[in-house]
Amino acid sequence: DGIIAVQGERTSYSAVIAVPGADRIFLHDPGCNDTFTFADIDQKKLEDAVLFHFGYPPIMKKMYERGGEELEIMMKYMKEHGIATSMDAVDADSEAGRADWEAILKRVLPYVDFFVPSVEELCFMLDRPRYESWQKRADGGDPVEFLDPETDVRPLAERCIALGAKMVLIKCGAPGLYYKTADTGQRGALAAITGIDP
């Protein structure tokens, strides 16, 4: 009932290969993801929504083109209609990896309540030289094994909060998760929307 069918478009698919000691590998055909826009969403179906999760905007071409304008429009709409929002992040090796993600996040994070990137994705988006130094330091291994939460992860979380995210949950592989929240004033409306005290 909630699946959008578009005449002449093919279905997208993704397969994720997780190899120990390496970042995940994605096999992906974007299909109709390349043409998906906010206009494709039936807004009537959003009337009772409490949370809108948008997973992997980088595999949806229209979401990162024009500096993330379409993504901003969609997330802003959700916030204006009292819907809590969450979003995943970017695949560094994709076409989307060449987009200016820091500029896109600057536009979009003010409308995102829960931002859930991996530490590598986030570092790639906000600090590419640091990301490259992590890759070099890991020397073919898993970079997250060498990260220090205070000096490597915390600054990224703080940057996301400064850009407007209300809560940031950074996935750090086997070492675990790093969670940072904005101050209570910025998160205040979220409890009323979701019924949870963040």
Predicted regions and their residues:
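Ribokinase/PfkB-type carbohydrate-kinase core domain
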Residues: 2-198
